[in-house]
Amino acid sequence: MRTPRNQRSAEAVEAFTRIMGRKHVLTSARATAPFTTGDRFGAGEVLAVLRPGSLVDMWRALQVCVDHDLIVITQAANTGLTGGSGPGDQDYDRDIVILSTLRIDGIHLINDAREAISLAGATLFSLEEKLAAHGREPHSVIGSSSIGATVVGGIANNSGGSQMRKGPAYTEQAIFARVDEDGRIHLVNHLGIDLGTDPTHILDRLERGDWDAADVTPPPPDSTGTDYADHVRQLVDTPARFNADPTFLHEASGSAGKIMVFAVRTRTFPLEKDKATFYIGTDRPSDLEALRREFLAADGPLPISGEYMSAHAFDLATEYGKDTYVSLKHAGSRTLVRMFALKGWANGVFAKLPGFGPSTADAISQKLFSLVPENIPSRLTDYRDRFDHHLLLVVSGSERAATAQLLREFFAGPEHEGDFFECDADEAQSATLIRFGVASAASRYYVMHRAEASAMVTFDVALRRDDEDWLERLPEEIADQLRESAYYGHFFCHVLHQDHVAKKGVDPVALKKRMTQLLVDRGAAVPAEHNYGRIYPAPEQLVAHYRELDPLNMFNAGVGETSAKKGWG
């Protein structure tokens, strides 16, 4: 246990233990490490990690934090990529407590499963499983849902994802606690469900799902998308979506941990069981952009998703994301979640042993899975060899014929080069998993080449919707400082992930600032969907949102490179 700043902090640990038991109050460096270390960025010391088992215990723990002047970081799955789920290297003036919500994972379906009430630790994977039995699906259905990310975490960070009809994760219906400037805790119930007036009674009823149908407000109109589908079609000089967009900032939505969220109410969508997947290859980025504009201008419904990756990113995924690809393809999401947890635990153990490092489990996994055949379908590897740029396009089954016709006519034109094919079931699954594997490939590459690299320099970028020159071309003096780069993203939204590994001896902070400025000069917004965390300075309008939610600055202090001091001092 780290040394508390004062006796009051030590007393707080005793109070937490009385609330949830010693087993769920973690204080040793080894026990807290999986919670205090970010996936790519962020690490720091905490007084304790709390693992409450109920919403009422969350509420009671918050009261202890207020009474003992502690900073609270409410953490869900800790899958964030910018360090905002844990402490950072900042000048904190109070001890920090992480409150992990993962034990509180209940989900209540309401209004004939057209909406869901997800408690603080409910995962997207669990929600997806629960909704499938009702022929429904949640906002996010790929990517973060496979590594244990939570519904509340997605709302708090306005996560985007691949579903171009749906837009960022957003709700105006949530139940949360905020602390006012006088240090008083307020429970705010905007779920649209009458649960009474006493906070502990409300939270207990909420967790048990104890309400009458008549106490629940009706759902919104049912559809396969949102207004975002019309928004993304507009080819104007602004990004389609980005983290600081005030359109998507409302209480829990975009809160980045500046309040304590107990549950959110989100709409669900009809599950499209009949889908068609097309794999598209070209050597010219301009052809993909022209194709994007053809689909956005078409009269029919938007595709479900349109995911880009370079051929080089494909190669990185099959070499350095192979454990992700093989595990998901042959064992499923549940096994991958367990594997991530086991790897995190093992890295924590190895880090404490002489002669080992904090990435030993990654090295072992990399070696073991290199011996396993990936069995990638031949048409995918053929396109990998033939074309530099790839697009994975998923459409509704009813749009299969129209999509194939559009693609045939597009590539028949003398001004365009490339080819396509409709995937069979194995090809569709494999292509999707390779695209997902790219997201972890650059991180694994860095881990395996740490001796020759200084740091990862990563971006998630929201480009202008009308940006024709969308693929980054770095000046030579910047490109020479990079050892590796991977480009991939949600192409129709013009949201790209650009993961770089800087060479040994390069100043990654200075390099990131220079590269960020190049993007801003192009009219892009950074970040697009991973939020500001500990690596991006939040703009003024977003800081104003944070300060309104948290006037004492006791929740996730310092996020977005803001002040870590009490009262924003």
Would you name each region that the model predicts?
Residues 2-6, 20, 38-48, 70, ...:
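Conserved glycine-rich FAD pyrophosphate-binding loop
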Residues 108, 125, 132-287:
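FAD-binding subdomain of flavoenzyme oxidoreductases
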Residues 15-36:
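Conserved oxyanion/phosphate-binding beta-strand-loop segments in alpha/beta enzyme cores
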Residues 250, 260, 265, 276-283, ...:
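C-terminal cap/substrate-recognition region of VAO/PCMH-type FAD-linked oxidoreductases
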Residues 16, 65, 498:
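Residue-level signal for inorganic ion chemistry
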Residues 89-104, 110-150:
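Anion-binding (especially nucleotide phosphate/pyrophosphate-binding) glycine-rich loop
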Residues 24-29, 51-52, 72-76, 83, ...:
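General beta-strand structural signal in soluble alpha/beta enzymes
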Residues 29-104, 118, 138-139:
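Glycine-rich N-terminal segment of FAD-binding domains in flavoprotein oxidoreductases
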